[in-house]
């Protein structure tokens, strides 16, 4: 009982605190801000170079920018915008030694921070879902994908996602849910326990993560089927004297390699977001009277913020040579087994075809 009263007093003190306690350091926030801005700028520079290469391509040549890369560009822009709009408020709080509640009249800085934090976290997850859905349709329904989806349509995804995130995250401004300040006074978020809005927000993130994982699993299964079909076709054609379809087979292998690269990139981003969202989900579903809740407050926010820092670095690090290396490592054992099985199968088919020819001559 005493612990509950002490936690309640601490929570109330955090909500109304005007000054930061001595010993609070902006080091972690500064490092996160610098890493986020630098990573997003590097990712944007790499994407800009790819866009410039795409505009220089002739009409008959193969373009280098796909719908997937349009969505990646929008994700990086979202992460950069979120970092630049959120982190400076925290750094201003440290520089003035004031909490967010005291930083602006009527707690406007606290409301601004909480709204932008919820908005960009949801927008990021929706962008990852759009990328996963694009991969799912590209592999599972190629005819529908080529007929109805285009790069121009991808440009409309960002305003749609921003509009949906704006509507959902504005509910506390319409008195459903409430934004409050949390310890140590340098961040604000949805109030725990007043309404079910915090749990609703966490549930939406969980559902999006599950949907992204389901799309990725479906893409993996479809890629396995494509690999098996291409293996059979190569085996069937190896015993014949026809060489015409060689360029088509090379195109199929290139397409499969690109799809695998996109899947690796998307899978790592999804796993990163799932890990970064886990502390927040635990915090959202904790009992308000739990003595552990106070320890999870700042930890949950920092984990949620780290995602926008990691995403651009994932894209910047996983360049095509690195993706090819990862693909070769992941597929090494499978490739060895496939080659052995293919050689056995092809030799069997070749001997069978020879026997058929001999029978025809007799």
From Swiss-Prot:
Per UniProt, what is the membrane topology? Multi-pass membrane protein
Keywords, ordered alphabetically: Cell membrane, Disulfide bond, G-protein coupled receptor, Glycoprotein, Membrane, Receptor, Transducer, Transmembrane, Transmembrane helix
Its GO biological process terms? Answer: adenylate cyclase-activating G protein-coupled receptor signaling pathway; cellular response to prostaglandin E stimulus; positive regulation of gastric mucosal blood circulation; regulation of cell population proliferation; response to lipopolysaccharide; response to nematode; response to progesterone
**Where are the compositionally biased (Low complexity) regions?**
235-245
The chain's disulfide connectivity reads: 110-188
Organism's domain of life? Eukaryota
Q: Which InterPro entries match?
A: GPCR_Rhodpsn, GPCR_Rhodpsn_7TM, Prostanoid_rcpt, Prostglndn_EP2_rcpt
Q: Name one GO cellular component term.
A: plasma membrane
Q: Where is this region: Disordered?
A: 234-255
TM stretches of this protein: 25-48, 67-92, 113-133, 153-177, 200-224, 263-286, 300-323
What role does this protein play? Receptor for prostaglandin E2 (PGE2). The activity of this receptor is mediated by G(s) proteins that stimulate adenylate cyclase. The subsequent raise in intracellular cAMP is responsible for the relaxing effect of this receptor on smooth muscle.
Q: What name appears for this protein in its UniProt entry?
A: Prostaglandin E2 receptor EP2 subtype
Name its species.
Mus musculus
Give me the gene this protein comes from: Ptger2
């Amino acid at each position: 009982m005493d612990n509950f009263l002490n936690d309640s007093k601490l929570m109330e003190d955090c909500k109304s605190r005007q000054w930061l306690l001595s010993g609070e350091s902006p080091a972690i926030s500064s490092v996160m801000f610098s890493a986020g801005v630098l990573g997003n700028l590097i990712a944007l520079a790499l994407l800009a170079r790819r866009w410039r290469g795409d505009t220089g391509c002739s009409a008959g040549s193969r373009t280098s920018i796909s719908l997937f890369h349009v969505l990646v560009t929008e994700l990086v822009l979202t992460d950069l915008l979120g970092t630049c709009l959120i982190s400076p408020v925290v750094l201003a709080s440290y520089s003035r030694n004031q909490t967010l509640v005291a930083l602006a009249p009527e707690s406007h800085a606290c409301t601004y921070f909480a709204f932008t934090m919820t908005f960009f976290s949801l927008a990021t997850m929706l962008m990852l879902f759009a990328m996963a859905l694009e991969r799912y349709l590209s592999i599972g329904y190629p005819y529908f994908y080529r007929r109805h989806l285009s790069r121009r349509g991808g440009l409309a995804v960002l305003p749609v996602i921003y509009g949906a995130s704006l509507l959902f995250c504005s509910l506390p401004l319409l008195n459903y849910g409430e934004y409050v300040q949390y310890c140590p006074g340098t961040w604000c978020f949805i109030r725990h326990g007043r309404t079910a809005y915090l749990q609703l927000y966490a549930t939406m993130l969980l559902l999006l993560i599950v949907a992204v994982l389901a799309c990725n699993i479906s893409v993996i299964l479809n890629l396995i089927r494509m690999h098996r079909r291409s293996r059979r076709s190569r085996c069937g054609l190896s015993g014949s004297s026809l060489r015409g379809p060689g360029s088509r087979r090379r195109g199929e292998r290139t397409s499969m390699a690109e799809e695998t690269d996109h899947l690796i990139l998307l899978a790592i981003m999804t796993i990163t977001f799932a890990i970064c969202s886990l502390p927040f989900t635990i915090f959202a579903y904790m009992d308000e009277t739990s003595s552990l809740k106070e320890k999870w407050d700042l930890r949950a926010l920092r984990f949620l913020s780290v995602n926008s820092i990691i995403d651009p670095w994932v894209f910047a690090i996983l360049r095509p040579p690195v993706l090819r290396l990862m693909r070769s490592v992941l597929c090494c054992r499978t490739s060895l087994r496939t080659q052995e099985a293919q050689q056995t199968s092809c030799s069997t088919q070749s001997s069978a075809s020879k026997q058929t020819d001999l029978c025809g001559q007799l």
